[in-house]
């Protein structure tokens, strides 16, 4: 019985806390989303080039002894 009460109380507190959350406006949400999308498009090619370069360097080093 006590365990069920604790679970119930926990979810009641969670519900109360959701009312205190300051949710972003639509404008803020769109702006944040655009920042993330632009960052992904900027950093993806950089990661691709770095990965390809490291791969080629490792292949070169591993094939030296052959």
Curated annotation (Swiss-Prot):
Signal peptide: none annotated. One of its GO terms (cellular component) is plasma membrane. It is found in: Cell inner membrane. Pfam families: SecE. The chain crosses the membrane at residues 29-49. InterPro entries: SecE_bac (IPR005807), SecE_sf (IPR038379), Translocase_SecE/Sec61-g (IPR001901). Keywords: Cell inner membrane, Cell membrane, Membrane, Protein transport, Translocation, Transmembrane, Transmembrane helix, Transport. The keyword Cytoplasm does not apply. It is a single-pass membrane protein. GO terms for biological process: intracellular protein transmembrane transport; protein secretion; protein targeting; protein transport by the Sec complex. Gene3D superfamilies: Preprotein translocase secy subunit (1.20.5.1030). GO terms for molecular function: protein transmembrane transporter activity. Essential subunit of the Sec protein translocation channel SecYEG. Clamps together the 2 halves of SecY. May contact the channel plug during translocation. Belongs to the SecE/SEC61-gamma family. PANTHER family: PROTEIN TRANSLOCASE SUBUNIT SECE. Component of the Sec protein translocase complex. Heterotrimer consisting of SecY, SecE and SecG subunits. The heterotrimers can form oligomers, although 1 heterotrimer is thought to be able to translocate proteins. Interacts with the ribosome. Interacts with SecDF, and other proteins may be involved. Interacts with SecA. This is Protein translocase subunit SecE. It comes from Rickettsia montanensis.
């Amino acid at each position: 019985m006590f365990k069920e009460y604790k679970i119930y109380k926990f979810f009641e507190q969670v519900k109360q806390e959701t009312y205190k959350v300051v949710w972003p406006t639509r404008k803020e949400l769109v702006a944040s989303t655009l920042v993330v999308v632009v960052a992904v498009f900027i950093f993806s090619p950089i990661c691709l080039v770095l990965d390809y370069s490291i791969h080629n360097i490792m292949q070169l080093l591993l094939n030296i002894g052959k």
